[in-house]
Structure formats: structure tokens, C-alpha cells
UniProtKB/Swiss-Prot annotation:
It is found in: Cell membrane. Glycans are attached at N158, N203, N337, N386, N391. Keywords: Cell membrane, Glycoprotein, Membrane, Receptor, Transducer, Transmembrane, Transmembrane helix. The chain crosses the membrane at residues 39-59, 72-92, 173-193, 224-241, 262-282, 296-316. Its main location: membrane. InterPro entries: 7TM_chemorcpt. It is a multi-pass membrane protein. Probable gustatory receptor which mediates acceptance or avoidance behavior, depending on its substrates. This is Putative gustatory receptor 58c. One of its GO terms (cellular component) is membrane. It comes from Drosophila melanogaster (Fruit fly). Coiled coil: none annotated.
């Protein structure tokens, strides 16, 4: 019952922070759209978020021009920390407009999971828990950016004004952390859906392997026993292939719903990572109050944050590998089934034609250059794969090196 408890808690928190009005009914294994008063509560909370946003940004950045001790690097570092807050406008509008679509897709996914007995296993659960643990680095980084001694929030230009602003600044920091939680929920939801999809693909691949084993024990000579066995395998394959097509459509629709949020999250994370790595270099190179343990701690926090982003990409790469594994096993099934001596209207011939169509479909889906055959995953700009995250990492390092050279020329 652990998975039911975790799902129930997950959606309870999402309702508490006003992200959606979905409720998971563990007794019926489906999602329910809670209406009044849940909708009223969520709408009021979202309106409050929108109204508070400009005031929170002003409170957290209003001291930029009044901090004599804050250098340019420190100011930029603090302002970049707040860029993620601007994406919440896209997040909330998209989730609320498409909440009925999410409700339908979520129930379709739960049906597929329960058809395979909904036993996700330790690997899937551990992946989601590890992703959640790594996501906490976002909150640590934001808190560190807003509360360190050289932050704009802690500017000491006017001590009396600072004391008067402390309650408002504390409230603004809590607001910023809630906004990070909202955006983290989107990334986590996409990740959980992909993990569940990968688990379903593993079970479907196992089903194909069982068909291969059944086909191998059938008599080689054409006759009634072989024909009856082929009819059963053909019926099982049709059912399995419908589930494969449905799963492919579900995963694509989930990504389509959240693609703009994922795009803006990745864009702000890209800028965020450059600022964090550059700030780490500034601290190691120029800080007069340098402490080795602080440098190591900052490095660990940055690496944790970056690994969390890599996990977001790698789950899509794992999904591709699972489809490739399914493709290979379907090819093996076709090889064993194919025989030139079969009658045109036999179940074996029909199964071969069905398998050939499936092989063409998956080969087209899994081409190395997806631009030729389909839209890329995220707004038609790039694919979520290990290649993309490696390019992103190289770009981050390159930009930091360029900034370091500029800093040396200007301040070195």
C-alpha cells in the first residue's frame, strides 16, 4: 500500500499549495476532480500568488541600488536566483486550463498500471524518491542565494530600514520557496509519469518474450495444433500492441501539456547553473573570507542540482532504450514466426504482417534524427536525451569560462 499512500500524499500537497484539484481515490484506483470548495480554495490561492508576485520581487531585489558593499557579481547572482519565479505564470495557467485533460490521461495511465497489477517495484519507487531528494537542492540553493552575507536581502545600508523590512522579506522568501515547490511539482510529475511508462514498457517487453517462448514450443509442421497456438498468440499480440500504442500516445500528451513549463524551467535552470558555477569560482578565487569547507559545500550543492537536471533528461533516454528493447524482441518474434511455407490466410501470416507494421512504426519512432519524422519533444526545439544534457553541460562550462576571462581582464 506504500504506492497508494505516496500518491495520496503527493496530491494532497498539490491541492494544499493550489496547483490542482485532483484527488487520488485509492479504493477505486482512479483520480477524482474535486470541485467546490477545493476549486474555490485553489483559485483564491492562485490569484493571491499572482498579486503577491510583483511585491515579492520588489522586496527581494529592491535594495540593488542601495547596497554599497554588494558587488556586481553578488547582485547578478541574487537576481538570477529569482528568474524561476516568473515561470509560475505559465505553469498555473496551463495546469488549470488543461486540468480535465490531465484528469483523463491520469486515469488512463492508472488503468494501464492496474492491468499489470500495479506493482511498480523498488527500482521505480527508489528513482522517484531519489529525484525528490535531489530536487531539494533547489530550495537549498535559493535559500543560500537569498540569505548569505553578501545577498541583496541582507544589505546593511540602513539598519533601521532593514529591521522594519525583516517581516516582509521573510514572507517574500517563503513565497519564493512556495513558487519553487510549484515548479518542482511539474518536473516531478513528468518524471513520475515517465518512470511509470518505462515500467509498463518493461512488462510489455516481457510479454513479447513470453510469446517468443510459446511460439518456440509449437510444432514446426503446419496443422491444427500450430494454427490454434498461433491464433492465441495473435490475439495476445493485438491486445499488447493496442496497449503499446496507447502508452505512446499517453506519454506524448503528457509531455505536450507540460512542454512549455519544462522549456522555461530548463531555460532558467541553464542561467541558474551558469550563475551558481561562476559564483563558486568567484568565491574560490577572490573571497577574502574563504573557507575550504564552504567551497566544498557549495560545490556539492551545485553538483547535486546538476545531477537532478541530468536525471530529468536521462529518464527520457531510458524510455528510448526501453522502446529499443521492445523493438528488438518484436524483431525476434517476427524472425521465429516467419515462414515462407505458410498459407496466405493463416494466423501465422497475419501475425507476420502485424509484426511488420509494428516494426516499421517503432523504427520510424526511434530514428536517430527525429527531425525527419516527428516533432521534437520540447516545443519543437530539442529532444530530451543524454545528448542534449551533455550539450547543455558543455555550454554551461563554456559560458562560465568566458565570464571568468572577462572578470580577469576587468578586475584581475
Amino acid at each position: 500500500m506504500n504506492q497508494y499512500f505516496l500518491l495520496h500524499t503527493y496530491f494532497q500537497v498539490s491541492r494544499l499549495i493550489g496547483l490542482c484539484n485532483l484527488h487520488y481515490d485509492s479504493s477505486n484506483h482512479r483520480f477524482i476532480l474535486n470541485h467546490v470548495p477545493t476549486v474555490v480554495y485553489c483559485v483564491i490561492l492562485n490569484v493571491v500568488y499572482l498579486l503577491v508576485l510583483p511585491f515579492a520581487l520588489f522586496v527581494l531585489t529592491g535594495n540593488i541600488y542601495h547596497c554599497p558593499d554588494a558587488g556586481m557579481f553578488g547582485v547578478v547572482y541574487n537576481v538570477v536566483a529569482l528568474t524561476k519565479l516568473l515561470t509560475m505564470l505559465f505553469l498555473m495557467s496551463s495546469v488549470w486550463i488543461q486540468r480535465r485533460r490531465l484528469y483523463k490521461l491520469g486515469n488512463d495511465l492508472m488503468k494501464m498500471l492496474h492491468k499489470f497489477r500495479f506493482n511498480l517495484g523498488n527500482d521505480c519507487r527508489n528513482r522517484c524518491l531519489c529525484k525528490g531528494l535531489l530536487t531539494s537542492s533547489r530550495f537549498v540553493l535559493l535559500t543560500q542565494q537569498l540569505l548569505t552575507r553578501d545577498s541583496v536581502v541582507n544589505c546593511e545600508s540602513n539598519s533601521s530600514l532593514r529591521q522594519a523590512m525583516v517581516p516582509y522579506q521573510s514572507a517574500a522568501i517563503v513565497y519564493a520557496l512556495i513558487m519553487i515547490l510549484l515548479m518542482s511539482y511539474v518536473d516531478m510529475t513528468v518524471y513520475m509519469v515517465e518512470v511509470a511508462g518505462n515500467w509498463l514498457l518493461v512488462n510489455m517487453t516481457q510479454g513479447v518474450r513470453e510469446m517468443v517462448q510459446d511460439l518456440e514450443v509449437l510444432p514446426e509442421r503446419n496443422g491444427i495444433p500450430r494454427e490454434m497456438g498461433l491464433m492465441q498468440i495473435l490475439a495476445a499480440w493485438r491486445k499488447l500492441w493496442r496497449r503499446c500504442r496507447r502508452l505512446d500516445a499517453l506519454l506524448k500528451q503528457f509531455v505536450d501539456i507540460f512542454q512549455w513549463q519544462v522549456l522555461f524551467n530548463l531555460l532558467t535552470t541553464y542561467i541558474f547553473s551558469i550563475a551558481v558555477l561562476f559564483r563558486l569560482w568567484i568565491y574560490l578565487e577572490f573571497d577574502k573570507n574563504f573557507h575550504l569547507w564552504k567551497g566544498i559545500l557549495y560545490a556539492i550543492i551545485f553538483l547535486t542540482h546538476h545531477v537532478e537536471i541530468v536525471m530529468q533528461f536521462s529518464i527520457f533516454e531510458i524510455n528510448r532504450c526501453k522502446w529499443l528493447g521492445l523493438l528488438e524482441d518484436v524483431g525476434n518474434l517476427w524472425d521465429i514466426n516467419y515462414s515462407g511455407r505458410q498459407c496466405i490466410k493463416s494466423s501465422g501470416t497475419i501475425l507476420s504482417r502485424k509484426l511488420e507494421f509494428s516494426l516499421l512504426y517503432m523504427n520510424r519512432k526511434l530514428q536517430l534524427n527525429p527531425k525527419r519524422v516527428r516533432r521534437l519533444h520540447i516545443v519543437g526545439l530539442f529532444d530530451l536525451s543524454n545528448l542534449t544534457v551533455h550539450n547543455m553541460t558543455r555550454s554551461i562550462i563554456t559560458n562560465v569560462l568566458v565570464l571568468c576571462q572577462i572578470a580577469y581582464k576587468k578586475y584581475g
